[in-house]
Every structure is written in C-alpha cells, then in structure tokens.
Amino acid sequence: MIAHIFIFSKAFKLGSEDFRKSITRMVYGVTCFGLLFALVGTVLGGVWANDSWGRFWGWDPKENGALMICLGALIMLHARMGGYIKDLGMNVIAVLILVITVFSWWHVNQLETGLHSYGFTSGIMRWLYIVYAIECAVITIGLSCYRSSKKGFFHVPAAVSFFLLAFIFTVAFVTMAFTTTS
C-alpha cells in the first residue's frame, strides 16, 4: 500500500523527489521484511504438511500462491539490485505483488479444490474483482507516469524479470485453469 503513495505522488506531482525516494526505501524495506516471513512461513508450512500428510509440496493452489508471493518479491528485489528497475518500476511491481497476495490469500480459497478450499464466503468474489480493478487502475497510472517521464521506467532491458513475472502469472492461471469448481 505504501507504493500507492509513491505512484499518486509521482502522477499528481505531489511532494519532492526526496519524499518519493524515502517512500521507495520504505517499500524496499517492507518487501525485504515480508519476503523473510513469506519464505519462513512457506518452508515451515511445508515441514508441517510433511508431518501431517506425508508430503512437503503437492502443488495445491494455496501452496502455489505462497510460491508466487515469494517469487514476486524475489523478482522485484533482484531487479532493483541489478539495476533493471528504478523507483517507479519498483513501486509498480510492489502493487503487482499486492494483487498476487490478494489472489493467493483470498481468491484461491474460493476455488473449491485442494486442501485449502475452506473459504466459501458469500459475496467475496465481487469484492475481489473490485480490488483487482482498483489495483489495475493504480498500475495503469504508474505506467502512464513512465510514459510521461524522461528518465523512464526501466534502466536497462529487463527480459529476465519479465520472464519471471510471466512465470508467476502462468502458475496463477494454470492453478485456476486446472482446478474445477462444482
């Protein structure tokens, strides 16, 4: 959510460049912190699953969601450290990771398949699609800032980062496509 402040600040020319740099540092720090706990939670969840069901990883939709969160954060941090993305790119990808997290935490529960199919909350799908629409609008605003800026969104071509992001979305859509809802 901190990335939203950066994107709106950049889009509407609010705040100074130093303010936006501090926001980007916060996004970086929160992502590092979140990645640490996502990795620990994913590994400990796998250990617990192995003790409970006799398997570490079964490609359950919830497990895939945990993997997508970790991969998304790793991609963003590596792209930033490698110089592939600048401040705007990092914040736009942070919003994309938020969408992945919403999908992984709430949308996957509605698939009615796998070990984690327990969240059949009525009316939640409408709210999920509203969140997706809002976040797509924020990403679009961020990308429009790229088009209007002279410095640009990406420092150098980031084919590797885009490949890995495409992999995350492939895992997400394959998870949805190969799970049946009755």
Positions of PLM-derived features:
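Hydrophobic cores of alpha-helical transmembrane segments in multi-pass integral membrane proteins
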Residues: 1-13, 22-52, 61-115, 125-182
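Conserved non-cysteine loop/helix-boundary elements of the Radical SAM core domain that shape
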Residues: 19
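Catalytic nucleotidyl-transfer cores of nucleotide-processing enzymes
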Residues: 120
